[in-house]
């Protein structure tokens, strides 16, 4: 029998091959990456970490483990910014991993003042 192929579908999510081929990333973390990528492209909705945690059938511990793995492997950046005396957090899902800090602290002007590797 000839090798089979998947039928193409409409309404699909495009994911960089980098993470799918990264042998250092667990399937759990790859799955979370894919889910996040699929949802953040939806218009008219701001997604939070908690929104994605609620989608995790495996529970908080498994979600936290995959989230941590994405941060530590460089696929997920956390930006913590001062906003009129309050802290605001934004998450950035990267197509390719970046070395260095995964959590960046910004002042009111948007300048990075410290990170998870070097606190000011």
How should each PLM-predicted stretch be described?
Residues 1-10:
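N-terminal leader segment of winged-helix/HTH proteins
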Residues 6, 85-87, 96, 118:
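Short, intrinsically disordered low-complexity segments
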Residues 10-19:
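Short amphipathic alpha-helical segments and their helix-coil junctions
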Residues 18-30, 36-91:
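Winged helix-turn-helix DNA-binding recognition segment
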Residues 93-120:
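Charged low-complexity intrinsically disordered patches
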């Amino acid at each position: 029998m000839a090798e089979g192929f998947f039928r193409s579908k409409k309404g699909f999510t495009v994911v960089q091959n980098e993470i799918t081929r990264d042998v250092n990333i667990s399937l759990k973390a790859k799955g979370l990456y894919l889910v996040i990528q699929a949802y953040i492209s939806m218009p008219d909705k701001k997604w939070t970490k908690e929104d994605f945690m609620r989608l995790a059938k495996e529970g908080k511990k498994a979600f936290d483990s995959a989230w941590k793995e994405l941060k530590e492997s460089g696929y997920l950046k956390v930006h913590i910014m001062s906003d009129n005396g309050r802290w605001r957090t934004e998450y950035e899902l990267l197509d390719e991993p970046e070395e260095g800090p995964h959590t960046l602290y910004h002042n009111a002007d948007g300048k990075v003042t410290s990170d998870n590797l070097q606190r000011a």
